[in-house]
């Protein structure tokens, strides 16, 4: 069997899911109308030893057969009771297993047989990203096997009820495999997951876009990577992705979406500027999607936005086309320039130029005059409450346009609103380490002294614009900004710098005196130090900049000199 290339069909065709599950309830309680169980059940047999699955089960108290959800967390996470309870309160029976395996200072985990130590996430090693033998001898095979037996457990409780899938990051990759190979799934929602793990570090639009192939890569691509499973999807699919995801190339997200079985309902949404996280708009999409396919609610699911880049009256524009079957409430278009590295792109909002009938709009793309290409995507929200996005469109720029922009030293002023800023730290109000669950805008304008407003986030601010050629500081540039903080605080200013791979963080701690006044600060590269106290070589090496304080503050007039 070694070196055999297995496809999604051949990999799972002989899987034995006929073994008895034998569930044991470890703990059971009822609170606020929700039944909570912690349980163990058996998974597949490995050399005469069964996988011992730990999971959390939540359901509306007193209901016998509500529609069910299998929620698969990220590989570094475990069952999240709060997240499971959220859906139980909405009328779903939820099973959320641990599949990461043995974990420090944790007793509630899935126990894998000694023959497959790589099923434990911390011991996965090469089995996570390589199929050195076959796709069966990988961590993914064992994790999908856990998920299959979890589905069997849910089915054993109520054989006729519908089962939906939600998978987060690595859990989303598992969901792709399950949606393609397990009969009876009613809908699947992979979150920040869409395959192409074999292509990590290979930019879709770079000079060298081809992967160096050998037998091992063929085995991984054929039997593990999620894009191989998309064409076999047996249920409706909602893809939720984030544009600045460090672990998944946003440029390739729509490639996976396009491969989904055309006979299945499907749609797509991008969380703008987020890194492996989804905001309340995407969470609302998720709720509507499962309501439709698990509860039978009448919900209009729009098709993804169509987008193209063209010239109009001498200007560079994006043409947006909407689903004619729905009523659009608003549309936002985002543009980035030149940067092939999708996690560090500066996505800036574009201005509506005009409407062309009921179903088309044109947005101006005010690109830098020396930019060689633009990246553009759109997202639209419909009156039904559902929001969808387009693919990331790319166009090489070979002509001059009347709306081209000159180089600028002004990175930000409050006239820009909150444009280009995102969250630095997802450290609270986050469900399942992924969904930002807050009613207020996470990045907003707040008023400071003299009626002057600045940008603020209690999660800290992150800003990629300093990485754009149009705004990039000179070799000996200085960073200047105004800050308002009503009380004394320490502001952590960090710059991520370096070429290729994960940027190195260089930090500067500023003591802010506080008070009802704006204070200006001027920083040079040498003010920023790495963890080993190495100074930043120059601001022109910056790929992003962040501002964070435990106290309230706001920033304005960010520029370089």
Residues covered by each model-derived region:
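Surface beta-strand/loop "capping" patches
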Residues: 291-330, 335, 348-358
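Extracellular ligand-binding interfaces
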Residues: 454-533, 548-561
């Amino acid at each position: 069997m070694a070196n055999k290339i297995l496809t999604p069909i051949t990999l799972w065709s002989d899987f034995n899911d006929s073994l008895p599950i034998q569930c044991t309830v470890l703990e059971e309680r009822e609170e606020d109308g929700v039944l909570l169980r912690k349980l163990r059940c058996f998974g597949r047999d490995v050399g005469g030893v069964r996988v011992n699955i730990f999971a959390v089960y939540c359901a509306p108290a007193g209901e016998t057969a509500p529609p069910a959800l299998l929620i698969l967390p990220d590989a570094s996470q475990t069952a999240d009771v709060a997240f499971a309870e959220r859906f139980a309160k909405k009328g779903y029976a939820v099973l959320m297993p641990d599949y990461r395996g043995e974990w420090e200072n944790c007793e509630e985990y899935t126990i894998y047989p000694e023959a497959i130590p790589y099923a434990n996430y911390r011991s996965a090693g090469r089995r996570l990203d390589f199929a050195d033998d076959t796709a069966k001898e990988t961590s993914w095979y064992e994790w999908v096997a856990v998920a299959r037996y979890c589905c069997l457990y849910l089915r054993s409780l109520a054989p006729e009820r519908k089962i939906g899938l939600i998978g987060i990051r690595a859990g989303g990759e598992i969901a792709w495999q399950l949606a393609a190979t397990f009969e009876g799934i009613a809908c699947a929602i992979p979150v920040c997951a869409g395959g192409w793990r074999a292509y990590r570090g290979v930019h879709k639009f770079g000079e060298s876009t081809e992967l160096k192939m050998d037998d091992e890569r063929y085995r991984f691509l054929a039997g593990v990577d999620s894009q191989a499973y998309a064409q076999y999807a047996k249920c409706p699919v909602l893809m939720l992705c984030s544009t600045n995801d460090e672990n998944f190339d946003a440029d390739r997200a729509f490639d996976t979406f396009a491969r989904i079985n055309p006979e299945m309902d499907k749609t797509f949404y991008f969380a703008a500027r987020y890194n492996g996280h989804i905001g309340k708009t995407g969470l609302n999409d998720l709720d509507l999607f499962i309501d439709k396919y698990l509860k039978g609610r009448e919900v209009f699911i729009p098709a993804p936005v169509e987008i193209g880049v063209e010239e109009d009256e001498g200007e560079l524009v994006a043409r947006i086309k909407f689903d004619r079957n729905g009523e659009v409430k608003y549309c936002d278009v985002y543009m980035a320039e030149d940067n092939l590295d999708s996690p560090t792109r500066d996505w800036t909002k574009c201005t509506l130029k005009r409407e062309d009938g009921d179903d088309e709009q044109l947005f101006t793309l005010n690109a830098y005059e020396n930019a060689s290409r633009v990246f553009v995507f759109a997202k639209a929200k419909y009156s039904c409450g559902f929001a969808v996005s387009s693919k990331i469109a790319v166009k090489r720029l070979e002509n001059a346009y009347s709306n081209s922009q000159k180089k600028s030293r002004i990175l930000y002023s409050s006239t820009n609103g909150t444009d280009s800023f995102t969250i630095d730290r997802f450290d609270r109000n986050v469900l399942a380490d992924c969904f930002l669950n807050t009613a207020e805008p996470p990045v907003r304008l707040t008023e400071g002294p003299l009626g002057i407003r600045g940008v603020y986030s209690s999660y800290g601010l992150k800003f990629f614009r300093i990485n754009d050629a149009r705004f990039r500081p000179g070799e000996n540039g200085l960073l200047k900004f105004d800050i308002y903080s009503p009380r004394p605080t320490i502001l952590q200013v960090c710059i991520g710098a370096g070429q290729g791979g994960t940027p190195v963080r260089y930090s500067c701690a500023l003591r802010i005196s506080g008070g009802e006044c704006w204070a200006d600060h001027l920083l040079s590269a040498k003010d920023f130090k790495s963890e080993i106290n190495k100074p930043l070589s120059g601001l022109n090496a910056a790929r992003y900049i962040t501002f964070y304080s435990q106290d309230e503050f706001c920033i304005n007039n960010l520029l370089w000199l």
